[in-house]
Amino acid sequence: MTNKGWRAALVISAGIGLSFNASAGFKVVALGVNGGVEEGNLTSYLIRSDDQTRYVGLDAGSVLPGIGKALEKSSFPDITAENSAPLTPKGAVFRNLISAYFISHGHLDHLAGLIIASPQDSKKPIYGSAETIDTLRQYYFNWKVWPNFSDSGSGQRLGTYRLNAPRPEQRFSLGLSGLDGVIYPLSHGGVSSSMLLVSRNNESFAYFGDTGADKLEKSRHLDAVWRVLGNEIKQKRLKGLIIETSFTNQMPENQLFGHLTPALLLGELKNLEGYAGGEGSLKGLKVVISHIKPSLTAGADPRAEIHHQLEQNNHLGVNFLFMQQGDSLEF
């Protein structure tokens, strides 16, 4: 990693928002960055175009706690108590700035925040694969687990959320955000997951839900995604991506359950490099590492270990970034 990259990673790890590019195309805010265990900091990000004000939620494991932390870190500098009234600043971001959600798959650590906060949310669409939308409809918004705040499914339909399952690999509009999206399937230990390619103004950003490596999943889903992103890189459109690395390299492959390690991620990114133009084509690519699973073992620091293992073998020149809850970045 370059000196600039190391400084960026250190600043982000300290919890300070940072802009790398004066002509940034997207702003990303981390509402939650962990891959489980602690319910207040679960996977959830916001993204918007730099010429728009409304965000799309990228998963929703922890929403309101993350908004609170982001406000503390001035990640929403235009939101004040005065211009939020009669709402709180947290309420203004939640109800007014988040215009839509994309849910990558139906696991609880990716949507618990949306479910819990739904009674006070404003009307907005939720996008996901057909499998994800069906999971929301059947197993969450069903008046057994939770009241039905959607516009379909069983019992009274309260209609806060419009459930949408766009066709895979076809472009659609992401609510009122001004962003377009395309959903691609991923494999997550036998569970259907997905990646969202966000685009606007001939620029793009990729958000990955949970995924295992193709060789372990007996799948070609990541290979298909790398082909798409390789072309985005060749066309100089891809501004960055968020992808999981849940475990350190010490985790046995038969205990990954559809997740990545640093070694597996680097192997997959090597495949992307081939589609992006060959050696050196990923140099400087900003890759946010997400979904690290915290440990309850004394002295263990999986975040630091994953960071070390990625950098130790980073022969691709990728700029690995580690956001903390509440941080914002421009791409």
Language model feature labels by segment:
Residues 44-48, 165-234:
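Catalytic core of the metallo-beta-lactamase
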Residues 37-102, 106, 112-119, 217, ...:
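Pre-active-site segment of Zn-dependent metallo-hydrolases
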Residues 19-22:
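N-terminal signal peptide c-region/cleavage motif recognized by signal peptidases
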Residues 89-156:
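Active-site HxH/HxHxD metal-binding segment of metal-dependent hydrolases
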Residues 131-193, 315-329:
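Metallo-beta-lactamase
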Residues 214-324:
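Cap/insert and terminal regions of metallo-dependent hydrolase folds
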Residues 57-61, 97-109, 127-129, 207-210, ...:
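Active-site neighborhood of phospho(di)ester-bond hydrolases with catalytic His/Asp-centered motifs
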Residues 1-10:
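Bacterial N-terminal signal peptides that target proteins for export
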